[in-house]
Amino acid sequence: MGDAALRAKWDRASRLYDWMTWGDIHRFGPAKRRLCMAMQGRCLMVAAGTGNDFRCFPPGLDIVAIDVSSEMVAQARIKAKAYDGVLEVRQMDICALDYPDGTFDTVVTACTFCSVPDPVRGLRELRRCLKPGGRLLMFEHVRSRIGPIGLLQDLMTPITRRFGPEMNRDTVGNVLRAGFDIEREENVYLDVVRTITARRPDTA
């Protein structure tokens, strides 16, 4: 999928995005808040969508939130006004971040890498923009290691990718391939929804 098609896909999705994700917001909000408690320093949130996860951020931080969709960004900017801290929302592609190397202390993702067309490239770009020792905090849908569930995800993915995520991504493997060290994994729902804490090595 080209860049223009990707933007158009998420522009269309923005119209019903809050309605489609209402259940997840309430179901997974506590897990996201626990993950976000580790945010520190200058922070980047990628694929922010309409900004529903802004409520999970600790107060008083300096945060940039990006999304590829101009329609998502427009809605997210409205929600950003309620944040108790600095929260700038920009339209930007995760695979071409307009920031110098080592800009951020923390990067946050929430259901992001089930949708990025080239996930390893996107993760390498996040690694570039993190300071050495900086942390990547991820809340993601991943492919199950339980055989029947993983197979079901494989069968569902050709359908789900038409309107949003790919359900069978090996996100943990992709994080390692991008050059991160994984510090912690935690299952949130079975092993399909998972939090991952990773770190950019100090010497790389």
Regions found by a protein language model. Name each.
Residues 196-204:
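C-terminal lobe and adjacent flexible extensions of AdoMet/dcAdoMet transferase-like proteins
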Residues 120-132:
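A short glycine-rich, Lys/Arg-flanked "PGG" loop and its adjoining helix->strand segment in the class I
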Residues 106-118:
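A short SAM/SAH-binding and catalytic strip from SAM-dependent methyltransferases
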Residues 4, 20-24, 137-195:
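C-terminal alpha-helical "lid/dimerization" subdomain adjacent to the S-adenosyl-L-methionine
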